[in-house]
């Protein structure tokens, strides 16, 4: 995706990172596009400054203006119940696109918030929609990404309804491992950018249960925990 330095304010030479040179392009919209198609996509992507930790990208009720591609960092999606309680629905990692929830009614039904300083590419939806009508590969890629999101939602439902607390956390760590591996990061060593409370909220478990299970996994030698850093020692034991 495109990141452009602001020469007017910095006095530096204009520098651009295009989709063709992006390390996560195979996970994102550019995947399978020709050079000409990539150029057209590149031209509609807007520069986005780094999103700071805790910054809200969009909130419930906002009109759909853009889809957001995550270049680095972690974003959480959540809803707020009538009683004011937060329910986390997803954690988005590099290569993920955020904002598909608004396509049906053209308004977002939930919130998206940065869990750490993150870099995102902003893709204006109306222009993307127009391009998709002209370029079958982009339309197919959008459908593929939306299908993957539906699949993740279905897996989440299964996770919460059929598994024990221990199985839920093991499956969560295994899923994170596979997702970090996709853009080329280590599958065995990674940082938990979300808090124990966030993980518990997502899995329907208490903070105490998350902490206790992480301690149990470490004691068994399955993982090593050092603050927010996780090392998976026996990957096969995390699969349910």
Curated annotation (Swiss-Prot):
One of its GO terms (cellular component) is cytosol. Residues 15-28 are annotated as: Essential for the oxygen-regulated activity. It is found in: Cytoplasm. Gene3D superfamilies: Jelly Rolls, Winged helix-like DNA-binding domain superfamily/Winged helix DNA-binding domain. Transmembrane segments: none annotated. Residues 163-236 form the HTH crp-type domain. The keyword Transcription regulation applies. GO terms for biological process: killing of cells of another organism. Residues 196-215 bind DNA. It comes from the Bacteria. Keywords: Activator, Cytolysis, Cytoplasm, DNA-binding, Hemolysis, Transcription, Transcription regulation. One of its GO terms (molecular function) is DNA binding. PANTHER family: CRP FAMILY TRANSCRIPTIONAL REGULATORY PROTEIN (PTHR24567), FUMARATE AND NITRATE REDUCTION REGULATORY PROTEIN (PTHR24567:SF75). Possesses 4 cysteines which may bind a metal ion (possibly iron). NCBIfam families: PRK11161.1 (NF008365). Confers a hemolytic phenotype on E.coli. May regulate, rather than mediate, hemolytic activity. This is Regulatory protein HlyX. It comes from Actinobacillus pleuropneumoniae. The gene is hlyX.
């Amino acid at each position: 995706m495109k990141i452009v330095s602001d020469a007017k304010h910095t006095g530096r030479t204009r520098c651009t990172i295009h989709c063709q040179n992006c390390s996560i392009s195979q996970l994102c919209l550019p995947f399978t596009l020709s050079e000409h198609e990539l150029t057209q996509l590149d031209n509609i992507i807007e520069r986005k400054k780094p999103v700071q930790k805790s910054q809200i990208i969009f909130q419930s009720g906002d009109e759909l203006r853009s889809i957001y591609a995550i270049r680095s960092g972690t974003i959480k999606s959540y809803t707020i119940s009538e009683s004011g309680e937060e329910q986390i629905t997803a954690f988005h990692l590099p290569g993920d696109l955020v904002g598909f929830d608004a396509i049906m009614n053209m308004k977002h039904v939930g919130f998206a918030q940065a869990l750490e300083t993150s870099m995102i590419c902003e893709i204006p939806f109306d222009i993307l929609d127009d391009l998709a009508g002209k370029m079958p590969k982009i339309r197919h890629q959008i459908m593929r990404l939306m299908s993957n999101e539906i699949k993740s939602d279905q897996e989440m439902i299964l996770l919460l309804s059929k598994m024990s607390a221990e199985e839920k956390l093991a499956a969560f760590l295994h899923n994170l491992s596979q997702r970090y591996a996709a853009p080329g990061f280590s599958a065995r060593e990674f940082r938990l950018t979300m808090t124990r409370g966030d993980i518990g909220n997502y899995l329907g478990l208490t903070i105490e249960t998350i902490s206790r299970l992480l301690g149990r996994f470490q004691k068994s030698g399955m993982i090593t925990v050092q603050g927010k850093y996780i090392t998976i020692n026996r990957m096969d034991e995390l699969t349910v």
